[in-house]
Amino acid sequence: MGKIKHIAIATQEPEKTAKFYKDVFGLEEVGQVSSDNAEGFYLSDGNINIAILRFKNEILVGEKFDTNYSGIHHIGFQVDDAEAADVKLRKADAFPMEEINSTLHAGMSRGRGGKNVELKYNGPDGVMIDISQTGWVGTEEE
């Protein structure tokens, strides 16, 4: 079975975006890129690599993003303490997406029927962030 090991996020501010993921989730910087095609950072939690890139080459960017965009919708992070993560997210200007969380009956604990609930936040560059203490279906709860 294939395993997810890499996610790339396009941004106009790679330093700011990388700082967000390092400060809030403790990801480590494992590399940098600066070329004619892109500049940015590679971050990791030891299991997955997240590329934070500002593309300089229109060919590499691919299709222009618009309302029909299909791509990364959100990234989920399993955290040890959802309340502590909430504090860090708010300090980094990432706030809960109240309408979505309300619709999903999301809160700081498990949802209806004991099922896991992820809290959604507005992350940098329009990428929605999920946090969960219990993980997701198909992942092991720590």
Q: Where does each model-flagged region fall?
A:
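N-terminal beta-strand motif that seeds the catalytic metal site of vicinal oxygen chelate
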Residues: 1-16, 72-79, 132-142
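Exposed loop/turn and edge beta-strand positions of beta-sandwich/beta-sheet ligand-binding modules
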Residues: 3, 37, 71, 115
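Core segments of cupin and vicinal oxygen chelate
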Residues: 10-50, 54-55
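Short connector loops at helix/strand junctions that flank enzyme active sites
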Residues: 45-47, 69-72
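A short local loop/turn or secondary-structure capping micro-motif enriched for an aromatic residue
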Residues: 58-62, 137-140
